């Protein structure tokens, strides 16, 4: 390898400086668990004192869920060329059921490792992979079913609770009752509850043993609704440095997991850079890379090529694989009369292979072989919906639901091997058909976590599909979907840039939070209540900081009221100083307090005073000035 830093390493270092700013008004804190090395990160939002006019009380800081890793902690020196610290390495080693290999097992991986032409784009540090010992199963589901609470399970329990016990103000704890549609929402998440949910298959904790840098998180309908962000280069756009930047950008704004969907050059090297710098689980669609290995000719794919790809990616540390094993030969003709046919890339690849060979999908016939690989590294299944509808006209048809039934069959098979599994879902579905999708998934797949792309609720808004899909995402999240895959404004139009990623994440953070509110997730409303209180008290900076995107909120406010003095003003540019509803309400309260009457009496008295004033001035609707 070259001794001097490569151009890519230099780019990575400059990126390090661009993505390490703390989120405005916040600081990173850590909540310790039962052991010294179990430190759960959260974002603490500092709040200012209520103005004397409104009571003058202190407003304690508020802790919120944080996905940004060390990138928003100014105390941590970030070097993307070195990667993140291996947070979970000791926990993995302590279990004694894995061993470090002396090299890569994948033939493709070994070939890349010894190709000097790739030195310029290779991740600098060499790391030896781990694998389960002979006969061992190292999945979190396997441990859970044996009654073991792992450090990872304790970690996510602390994380899910978000220090709600520190919120003592009853007005902030106020929350509307939810409608959970049969979900087992807990008032407090315990490590034992986490273990039970994973053991039952109702939740997954995606943590490959070769991704020790990841901060444990959980996906399940009885936990906070999560979101996924997609990144990845293509043959015509983006490079490694840009994808690493998009990773860090995604998690800064709230991406709980990230899928690398790269299909262009250097897929292997791009993925290594991403995983080594990711504090969140990374997912992939292995068939994309397998297709590259046969120069894009789907009919030339083989089980051996795909198997080698799975091992290659598992040894890099991919946490979950999208596997399109439910695209069966008999389902392909059912798509013939669809408006948009098969729109899933993975689904179309496997459909073409099935038709070319007139054989059953080799991902289906080799499914138990895949399970053997998954449980040797603790890679979770994300069973792909290769026949998802690509327009609302095709929603809930025989092809889509036939595949879903097969995914239910495969889920039960994966569970026999203690392999963690979630199910991917649509797609394009009008609002009135969304609940049918959720109900059928719960029924067919034994309550395994549902992971949906939207769904988009209308097809008429290219350029705004982050909105059309967030509508469906909020609904299906409320009905029980555990993780929502974001859609950006560029959906159907092009590869998203950094701003598109941010817009998509914001739309989906809103949808996920709205779903948590509707389900009645404990503490979900605390942040809403805190922001509403700040808004009523004209604490502008607190309003910005409590929002999902503090920078955007401040930017919009400052377009019209940029001065520091405006941060203390009792109005904004929407209504101005004389028509602010909240200022008027406060005036009514002040009048009531001064005159010793109720607010209702104050309003009545005020109306009488204004009536007398109107008559005294001549009772004319319009007066000459």
From Swiss-Prot:
The protein's required cofactors: [4Fe-4S] cluster
A GO term from the CC aspect: cytosol
The pathway this protein participates in, as annotated, is:
Cofactor biosynthesis; thiamine diphosphate biosynthesis
Establish whether keyword Secreted is in the entry. Answer: no
Q: Quote the record's binding site residues for Zn(2+).
A: 428, 492
Gene Ontology molecular functions: 4 iron, 4 sulfur cluster binding; carbon-carbon lyase activity; zinc ion binding
Tell me the residue numbers annotated for binding substrate: 230, 259, 288, 324, 344-346, 385-388, 424, 451
A Pfam family matched in the record:
ThiC_Rad_SAM
Which amino acid positions bind [4Fe-4S] cluster, per UniProt?
572, 575, 580
Q: Which domain of life is it from?
A: Bacteria
Cofactor detail note: Binds 1 [4Fe-4S] cluster per subunit. The cluster is coordinated with 3 cysteines and an exchangeable S-adenosyl-L-methionine.
Which InterPro entries does the annotation name?
Answer: ThiC (IPR037509), ThiC-associated_dom (IPR025747), ThiC/Bza_core_dom (IPR038521), ThiC/BzaA/B (IPR002817)
What keywords tag this UniProt record? 4Fe-4S, Iron, Iron-sulfur, Lyase, Metal-binding, S-adenosyl-L-methionine, Thiamine biosynthesis, Zinc
What's any GO biological process attached to this entry?
A: thiamine biosynthetic process
* Similarity section: Belongs to the ThiC family.
Tell me, in a sentence or two, what this protein's role is.
Catalyzes the synthesis of the hydroxymethylpyrimidine phosphate (HMP-P) moiety of thiamine from aminoimidazole ribotide (AIR) in a radical S-adenosyl-L-methionine (SAM)-dependent reaction.
Q: Which HAMAP family match?
A: ThiC
This chain belongs to the protein called Phosphomethylpyrimidine synthase
Q: What is the lineage of its organism?
A: Bacteria, Pseudomonadati, Pseudomonadota, Gammaproteobacteria, Lysobacterales
* Gene name of the encoded protein: thiC
């Amino acid at each position: 390898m070259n001794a001097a830093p490569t151009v890519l390493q230099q780019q990575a270092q400059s990126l390090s400086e661009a993505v390490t700013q703390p989120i405005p008004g916040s600081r990173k804190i850590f909540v310790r668990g039962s052991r010294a090395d179990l430190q759960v990160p959260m974002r603490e939002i500092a709040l200012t004192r209520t103005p004397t006019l409104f009571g003058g009380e202190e407003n304690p800081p508020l802790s919120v869920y944080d996905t940004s890793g060390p990138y928003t902690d100014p105390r941590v020196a970030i070097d993307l060329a070195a990667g993140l610290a291996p947070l979970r390495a000791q926990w993995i080693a302590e279990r004694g059921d894995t061993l470090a290999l002396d090299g890569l097992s994948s033939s493709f991986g070994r070939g890349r490792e010894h190709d000097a032409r790739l030195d310029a784009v290779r991740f600098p540090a060499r790391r030896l992979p781990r694998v389960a010992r002979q006969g061992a199963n190292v999945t979190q589901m396997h441990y859970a079913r044996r009654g073991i609470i792992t450090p990872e399970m304790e970690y996510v329990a602390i994380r899910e609770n978000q220090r709600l016990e520190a919120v003592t103000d009853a007005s902030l704890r106020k929350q509307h009752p939810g409608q959970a549609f049969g979900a087992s929402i807990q008032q407090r998440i315990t490590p034992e509850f986490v273990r039970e949910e994973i053991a039952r298959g109702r939740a997954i904790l995606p943590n490959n043993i070769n991704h020790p840098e990841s901060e444990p998180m959980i996906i399940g309908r009885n936990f906070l609704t999560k979101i996924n962000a997609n990144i990845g280069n293509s043959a015509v756009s983006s490079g490694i440095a840009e994808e690493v930047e998009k990773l860090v950008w995604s998690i800064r704004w709230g991406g709980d997991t990230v899928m690398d969907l790269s299909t262009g050059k250097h897929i292997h090297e791009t993925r290594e850079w991403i995983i080594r710098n990711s504090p969140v689980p990374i997912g992939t669609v292995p068939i994309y890379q397998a297709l590259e290995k046969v120069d894009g000719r789907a009919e030339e794919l083989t089980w051996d090529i795909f198997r080698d790809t799975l091992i290659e990616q598992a040894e890099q540390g991919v946490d979950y694989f999208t596997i399109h094993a439910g695209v069966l030969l008999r389902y392909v003709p059912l798509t013939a009369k669809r408006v948009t046919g098969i729109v899933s890339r993975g689904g179309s690849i496997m459909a073409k292979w099935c038709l070319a060979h007139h054989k059953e999908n080799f991902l289906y016939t080799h499914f138990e072989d895949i399970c053997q690989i998954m449980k040797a590294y603790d890679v979770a299944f994300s069973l792909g919906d290769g026949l998802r509808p690509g327009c609302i006209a095709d929603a809930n048809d025989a092809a889509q639901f036939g595949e879903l039934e097969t995914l239910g069959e495969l889920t039960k098979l994966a569970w026999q091997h203690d392999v963690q599994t979630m199910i991917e879902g649509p797609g394009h579905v009008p609002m009135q058909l969304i609940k049918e999708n959720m109900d059928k998934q719960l029924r067919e797949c034994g309550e395994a976590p549902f992971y949906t792309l939207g769904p988009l609720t209308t097809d008429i808004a290219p350029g705004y599909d982050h909105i059309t899909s967030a509508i469906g995402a909020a609904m299906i999240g409320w009905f029980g979907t555990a993780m929502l895959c974001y859609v950006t404004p560029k959906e159907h139009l092009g590869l998203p840039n950094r701003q598109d990623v941010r817009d998509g994440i914001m739309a989906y953070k809103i949808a996920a939070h709205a779903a948590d509110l509707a389900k009645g997730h404990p503490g979900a409303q605390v942040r809403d209540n805190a922001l509403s209180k700040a808004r009523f008290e004209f604490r502008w900076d607190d309003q910005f900081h409590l929002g999902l995107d503090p920078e955007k909120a401040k930017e919009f406010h400052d377009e019209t009221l940029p001065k520091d003095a405006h941060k203390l003003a009792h109005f904004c540019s929407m209504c101005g100083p004389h028509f602010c509803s909240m200022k008027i309400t406060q005036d009514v309260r002040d009048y009531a307090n001064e005159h010793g009457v109720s607010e209702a009496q104050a309003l009545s008295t005020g109306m009488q005073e204004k009536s007398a004033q109107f008559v005294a001035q001549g009772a004319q609707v319009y007066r000459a000035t």
